[in-house]
């Protein structure tokens, strides 16, 4: 049985399920596998987010010939003083109060003015396709996969998609996650390059960037 083609059943409010209810479900002969739906978050608690408004104010207005990067995150608020002219379009799946736009604004700032904020970044700025697809407190993987499928199909001309997000638990060391498999399938179907964060490093001492030879 190809599990990637099997229908998925999403169970919500699991804290309200009794052991008898779960036993009854798991005893169904048509159920092959049951896994908890992973929650994906934009950043680790305690990590400060710097939007970089000063650096954005120093760069020239966007050129229509510059490339476009889809930023799939918590979104950029409409009318943002520094970023609004850089946003070429919006796909909105999440609205306030489920998003506060903080992390998405910070990531979009790096796409637009990365070199001004980090000298090791390329000098070439990019315009932004703002995809508000992530709740500020985290999203279920199944929701993210659906939103990504919709976003990619709506803008086939955008070939780079930034995903500065990660799971609250580590990945399985022996197999790719459902989310990773979905990204591979979307990449192969639409020719999109997904740039995915490797994780947040919160231990002391904090790592510097860019990495030196020593």
Which residues fall in each region the model found?
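Short, flexible loop/turn elements at secondary-structure junctions
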Residues: 15, 38, 75-76, 132-137, ...
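Subtilisin-like serine protease catalytic core
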Residues: 57-90, 94-142, 189-191, 204
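Hydrophobic, Leu/Ile/Phe/Ala-enriched alpha-helical segments that form helix-helix packing faces
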Residues: 1, 21-30, 111-118, 148-152, ...
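Catalytic cores of nucleotide-enabled group-transfer and carboxylate-activating enzymes in metabolic
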Residues: 21, 50-52, 59-60, 105-109, ...
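Substrate-binding/access-modulating region of protease and related hydrolase catalytic domains
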Residues: 134-214
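Plant-biased detector of terminal regions, especially N-terminal secretory signal peptides
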Residues: 35-46, 62, 70, 123, ...
């Amino acid at each position: 049985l190809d599990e990637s083609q099997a229908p998925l059943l999403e169970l919500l409010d699991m804290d309200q399920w009794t052991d008898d209810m779960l036993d009854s479900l798991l005893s169904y002969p048509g159920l092959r596998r049951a896994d908890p739906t992973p929650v994906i978050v934009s950043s680790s608690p305690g990590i400060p987010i710097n939007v970089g408004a000063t650096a954005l104010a120093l760069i020239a207005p966007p050129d229509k010939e510059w490339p476009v990067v889809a930023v799939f995150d918590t979104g950029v608020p409409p009318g943002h003083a520094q970023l609004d002219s850089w946003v070429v379009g919006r796909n909105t799946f999440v609205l306030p109060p489920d998003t506060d736009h903080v992390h998405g604004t910070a990531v979009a700032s790096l796409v637009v003015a990365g070199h001004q904020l980090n000298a090791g970044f390329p000098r070439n700025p990019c315009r932004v396709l703002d995809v508000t697809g992530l709740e500020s407190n985290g999203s279920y993987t199944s929701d993210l996969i659906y939103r990504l499928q919709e976003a990619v199909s709506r803008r086939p001309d955008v070939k780079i998609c930034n995903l500065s997000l990660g799971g609250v638990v580590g990945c399985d060391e022996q197999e790719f996650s459902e989310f990773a498999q979905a990204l591979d399938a979307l990449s192969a179907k639409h020719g999109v390059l997904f740039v995915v964060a490797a994780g947040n490093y919160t231990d002391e001492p904090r790592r510097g960037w860019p990495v030196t030879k020593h």
